[in-house]
Each structure stands twice: as C-alpha cells, then as structure tokens.
C-alpha cells in the first residue's frame, strides 16, 4: 500500500491545496483523501494549544501505516505557526522544536519536510538558520515556482 501523505498548510487553505494538487496532475484528490492516503490539515490547529500536537499526529499516522501495511508516512509541514507572533522568543521555540525532531526515525518510517515561507526564513539570523540544519538535517532552498495554470 502507498505511504500516508500529510500536508499541513499554514498560509494556504485546504481547498487551495486540493486545487493545486489537481492542477499539477494529481487525479482524484478527494478519493485519495477518502481512502486515508492523503491528509490535508491546517497546521495552526496541530501546534496550538499543544506545541507537540503535530508530533502526536505523525506518530498516530505512523502507527496506522504500520497496521495497514503501508510503507510509512511523509509529512510536509508549513512552519509558519512559529512566525505568527514574531520576536526572537518564537525563533528560539522553533529551533528547539526542530532540534527535537530526529532526522531519521527508528521503526516509524517517517519522512518529514519542514517548509518555510521565504519571508519568514529571511527574518532568522544566520546563526539561527545554521541551528535549523544541525544534526544531519538538510536545507533545500526553493526560490521560484514555475507552476502555471
């Protein structure tokens, strides 16, 4: 069975994510959601009021994937929540949160991608950016979209 895909959006609506997926050729998006292979959620509700809510959700999905004989979970998560109120305290909270995420999971077969809006990422100091890519994590900087509709 296919992996469970989790898309946690912050700046886009759930409907716009469905539309974008359809526009780039993903067929039958709603049926993929209905069969449990795709979850699209608002990331705010997964971080607030419990900052570890996203971790708990991914762990639950990972266990479900194991029980269903799936290959695992891929989580694509917009980290915009951590920039919502601004200030250095939130950057520290973000860095601590990212540091708590293992680059490789043992037994869960989870692949995670933390996504940052360029405007948010540029507000971080150089040393904060370096801290985010510590412990075997990698940074992919996508600066331009070539998707046209």
Language-model segments: which ranges?
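Non-catalytic regulatory/interaction regions at protein termini and inter-domain linkers
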Residues: 1-149
């Amino acid at each position: 069975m296919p992996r469970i895909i989790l898309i946690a959006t912050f700046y886009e609506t759930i409907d716009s994510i469905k539309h974008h997926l359809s526009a780039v050729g993903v067929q039958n998006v709603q049926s993929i959601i209905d069969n449990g292979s795709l979850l699209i959620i608002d990331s705010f509700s997964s971080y607030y009021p419990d900052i570890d809510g996203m971790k708990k959700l991914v762990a639950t999905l990972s266990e479900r994937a194991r029980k269903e004989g799936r290959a695992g979970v891929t989580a694509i998560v917009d980290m915009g929540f951590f920039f919502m109120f601004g200030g250095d305290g939130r950057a520290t909270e973000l860095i601590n949160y990212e540091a708590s995420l293992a680059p490789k999971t043992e037994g869960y077969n989870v692949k995670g991608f933390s996504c940052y809006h360029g405007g948010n990422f540029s507000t971080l100091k150089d040393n904060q950016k370096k801290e985010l890519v510590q412990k075997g994590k990698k940074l992919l900087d996508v600066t331009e979209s070539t998707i046209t509709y």
